[in-house]
């Protein structure tokens, strides 16, 4: 069955607009995906007809809002096949989820002389929190290097582990190269050394199904806004036994059981003790609608369509004069490139004049830029609403830029 891309596009109102007098070709979904009417309408309806503060309210609106929020927690747990909805913490996004783990589990479990393993392809959100933790604790940060094709040098991984390795923190899919890392093999190796595993799933959950039980990771985190949902909301999954042992990171309302000026404070049970303050309830409702949307289309069908489009894009882009493509042949979601010796910002500005939106810069992956010896790259990302025609426009635009700039 053919993927209904035109029907999907009709659900995204922003795709009907023009930029610089030309139809918008939005090739920046890896930074943040556009939102379908179903998400916009669900969040709008909540604010119009159902808004109230959640938790402890005895009135109807509060009870309904609380129930709606907790239903999304259950829905998200099914989406990633968690064992229990109580293994999921609502966070602002992937970055906050990783910082929560670093400041809660990490503070409790990392000691001087311990080490944490990351890779050279990580987003800054999966580098900086571990650097800060290691500096605080006197621990060591170890790095898995890259092959020139943008895959990890896994033959070096075993040597990085030892009896002081406490955590492997690894991206599921690179936000620059599109490399999908072989998590089962990497997690199995971590288990041999008794290390925990955190997976940054920000660039994975929109492209194919994720099963955290099958992966057997300890932590998995992703953002709603890359999954066609609202900004400011994400999910942190933690194995239940581990989550129940973790101390809270932030203090405030909703995360307590009792508060006394003389007897101190006791915490709510997990996951609620990690959700201090008023939650982004509207964002949570929107996230639920986004999960409904991609589930109704079928992640397998989305993935098949995107892979077909990716193969076509790589074939066509390879024909552009003086282009350098970064990353492996088999990839998900993104194509990073440079055009001759022209700065990525200049190329991106020209493309914007043609109505084509791509991302330029270091993509929050400065160590990866340093490895390739470039200050920046252009990145085109492909989502379920992109088309062959938009790929053709990108190729034509780059060919024209090459002709104009030489």
UniProtKB/Swiss-Prot annotation:
Its cofactor is pyridoxal 5'-phosphate. This is Cysteine desulfurase. Belongs to the class-V pyridoxal-phosphate-dependent aminotransferase family. Csd subfamily. Pathway: Cofactor biosynthesis; iron-sulfur cluster biosynthesis. CDD domains: SufS_like (cd06453). NCBIfam families: PRK09295.1, sufS. Its main location: cytoplasm. It catalyses: (sulfur carrier)-H + L-cysteine = (sulfur carrier)-SH + L-alanine; L-selenocysteine + AH2 = hydrogenselenide + L-alanine + A + H(+). Pfam families: Aminotran_5 (PF00266). It comes from the Bacteria. The active site is at residue 364. The gene is sufS. It comes from Salmonella typhimurium (strain LT2 / SGSC1412 / ATCC 700720). One of its GO terms (molecular function) is pyridoxal phosphate binding. The modification N6-(pyridoxal phosphate)lysine is found at residue 226. Keywords: Cytoplasm, Lyase, Pyridoxal phosphate, Transferase. HAMAP family: SufS_aminotrans_5. One of its GO terms (cellular component) is cytoplasm.
